Amino acid sequence: MDKFLNFARKPRLVSILTLAALMAAFAGGMRIVRAQSTAPAVSSADSELITQFRRVEVASVSDAIEQITGKRMYMSHRMQPIFTSKFAGFARTVQLKKDEGNKDPEALSGMLEAIDQGSTDSVYVMAVEDGEDIAGMGGLMGTAMAARGYSGAVIDGGVRDVAYLRKIGFPVFATGIVPSTSVHHYRFAGAQIPLVCNGVPVSPGDIVVADSDGVAVVPKDQAQAVLSLAQQMDYKEHSMYAVIEQLKSIVAAVKKFGRL
């Protein structure tokens, strides 16, 4: 308990809500207590949209986006999960810029405040400038996100405290696992702004879908069209497995269903 109180005395490093979530998590073993949201409530229609996206495969989502928009909206092979997981949610974006050797105690406070403004069905999307060997997040931030009901996090940069994040079951995709810190090396550069994460443009409110195949980003104005097409693709592909086994021919199955 003393280490939490000492940590809390550092000016603005963590909010009361975040500290409460951390203390509750440790007091009750690994149980994460959900904090009251300060973000606008997710509508029932939006919640249902996210539920439906959780049920489709990222491969189908990626194909559907490309057919509808003509754009590649999937992240590269470097974006890897810390454990096998599947999630979807609305992008909550944060950007960090390099500021080597800064002694400003407020340099990263905006990053923490941005976390405390998220809620259920949020996906934390962070772009860390040249950040493959810098941990953009770790166990404390992951605990706060879990307490607030975030679906997961996608970090164009490193992640640390991986054993703890696995223990609490909070899913994170990142481009590396490293023990480093962003403190004194980086500065908060904005939240809820358009950014590029692992080569993919992401705007606040876009839908981020992740599974064992990787991460795809659905532009919010194309969400319903992409979902409908991805559902059709999933149905065809799942139907094809039995046909291929029965006929022992992928050529015949592709000809029948028109899906590859």
Regions inferred by a protein language model and the residue ranges of each:
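Bacterial N-terminal signal peptides that target proteins for export
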Residues: 3-18
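Bacterial N-terminal signal peptides
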Residues: 16-27
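Signal peptide processing junction and immediate N-terminal pro/mature segment
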Residues: 27-37
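Intrinsically disordered, low-complexity regions enriched in acidic/Ser/Thr/Pro/Gln residues
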Residues: 36-106, 236, 242-250, 255-256
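General beta-strand structural signal in soluble alpha/beta enzymes
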Residues: 73-76, 95, 125-127, 153-157, ...
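Acidic, glycine-rich flexible loop/linker segments
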Residues: 177-253
